[in-house]
């Protein structure tokens, strides 16, 4: 293994460790939420302060996880594969990862990113919209027991 590949491997391992912590906190937030998922708009509007904290933690960690994967891990993987990604936009990076079968779908990753942006940027959304987006994100976060999900 070349020095460059060793360095990339070390960076990947460090980022995987960071992602594992985010996944742990996501799981803790989901456990602490204590509501049936999918969650109705009525359920969402009647959440306790602690449940809202769990949702906030979920959103924060989900965002951090996706940022870490998109900004670092995906790029490191392609670097390791000797891909020139210097000036590539995120969509092209996702397409290459899909081609290598590293992610199942570039479109799905983009869709999840858009959902995450909607929920995390405090746009004025109806409670039904917030509940629907949260349910969709919850369904995309089945991390229990997965290392490097």
PLM ranges: what are they?
Residues 2-149:
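Solvent-exposed interaction patches of small proteins and small membrane subunits
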């Amino acid at each position: 293994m070349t020095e460059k590949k060793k360095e990339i491997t070390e960076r990947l391992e460090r980022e995987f460790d960071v992602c594992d912590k985010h996944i742990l906190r996501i799981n803790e937030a989901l456990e602490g939420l204590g509501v049936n998922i999918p969650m109705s708009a009525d359920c969402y509007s009647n959440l306790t302060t602690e449940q809202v904290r769990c949702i906030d933690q979920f959103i924060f960690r989900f965002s951090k996880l996706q940022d870490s994967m998109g900004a670092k891990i995906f790029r490191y993987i392609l670097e390791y594969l000797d891909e020139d990604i210097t000036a590539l936009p995120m969509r092209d990076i996702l397409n290459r990862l899909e081609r290598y079968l590293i992610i199942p779908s570039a479109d799905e990753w983009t869709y999840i990113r858009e959902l995450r942006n909607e929920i995390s940027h405090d746009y004025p959304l109806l409670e039904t919209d917030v509940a629907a987006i949260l349910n969709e994100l919850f369904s995309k976060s089945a991390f229990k027991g997965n290392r490097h999900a």
